[in-house]
């Protein structure tokens, strides 16, 4: 997790160092506020030459939902997504449309607290709510992930000092790491129950193996200085 954030920080600082001369020559840069599937955040944009822009950004998405009933287990759901980005835009065909490539440092976490309302299967065995107690699950995706996308909007070459941008793309992530534990139940420390709980955790992790991408759709409002 820390390695991912360190890598993207170094990448972003490198971009800013490289483009320093360009900023001095043009005297312009832009900042943008963003909202979309990554939550809310902001970007710093600087132009490199006539058709290349570099962006460094940060986004945050937090939300929670209480008392979701799934297969006789009542869950409280919480999501905390933190991302940092280093992106390069290549403007082709016209000044607005662009192809984008780069990296996102992801620190995304989903936690679930579950309370069975009746007997449920854990692994291959059925257990009562009293035996299970409460279940705590966590799915995490972190590290540095590549990004490819397209977009519209050119903060550095727009006729106006302010305007809108649109980005559509995909972050190619690792599959989530899953943890699952029980507390407050009569079987919470029972070796057989813990073995079945590990089977359940592995099944969930296997089911989530197909999730190796994160869709990005974001709308931005920029101001050029």
Residue ranges and their predicted role:
Residues 58-86, 108-145, 174-216:
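Extracellular/periplasm-exposed beta-strand and loop segments of Gram-negative cell-envelope proteins
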Residues 1-26, 209-210, 225:
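Cleavable N-terminal export/targeting peptides
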Residues 29, 38-42, 52, 82-86, ...:
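Hydrophobic, lipid-facing positions within transmembrane beta-strands of outer-membrane proteins
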Residues 35-39, 58-64, 103-109, 154, ...:
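Transmembrane beta-strands of outer-membrane beta-barrel pores
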Residues 31-33, 44, 54-56, 88, ...:
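Membrane-embedded beta-strand positions of outer-membrane beta-barrel proteins
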Residues 48-50, 92-94, 154-158, 225:
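Outer-membrane beta-barrel strand-turn architecture
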Residues 23-29, 50-52, 95-97, 144, ...:
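Outer-envelope beta-barrel architecture signal
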Residues 89, 93, 212-225:
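Outer-membrane beta-barrel "beta-signal"
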């Amino acid at each position: 997790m820390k390695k991912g954030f360190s890598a993207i920080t170094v990448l972003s600082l490198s971009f800013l160092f490289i483009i320093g001369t360009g900023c001095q020559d043009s005297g312009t840069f832009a900042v943008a506020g963003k909202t979309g599937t990554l939550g809310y955040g902001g970007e710093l944009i600087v132009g490199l030459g006539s058709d290349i822009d570099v962006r460094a950004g940060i986004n945050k998405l937090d939300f929670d939902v209480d008392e979701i009933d799934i297969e006789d287990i009542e869950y409280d759901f919480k999501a905390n997504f933190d991302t940092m980005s280093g992106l390069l835009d290549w403007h082709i065909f016209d000044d607005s449309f662009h192809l984008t490539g780069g990296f996102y440092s992801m620190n995304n976490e989903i936690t679930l607290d579950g309370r069975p309302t009746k007997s449920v299967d854990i692994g291959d065995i059925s257990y009562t709510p009293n035996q299970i107690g409460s279940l705590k699950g966590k799915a995490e995706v972190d590290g540095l992930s590549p990004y490819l996308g397209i977009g519209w909007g050119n903060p550095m070459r727009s006729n106006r000092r302010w305007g809108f941008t649109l980005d559509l793309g995909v972050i190619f992530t690792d599959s989530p790491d899953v943890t699952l534990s029980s507390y407050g139940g009569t079987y919470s420390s029972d070796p057989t129950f813990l073995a079945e709980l590990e089977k359940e955790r592995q099944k969930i992790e296997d089911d989530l193996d197909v999730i190796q991408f994160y869709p990005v759709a974001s709308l931005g409002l920029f101001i050029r200085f």
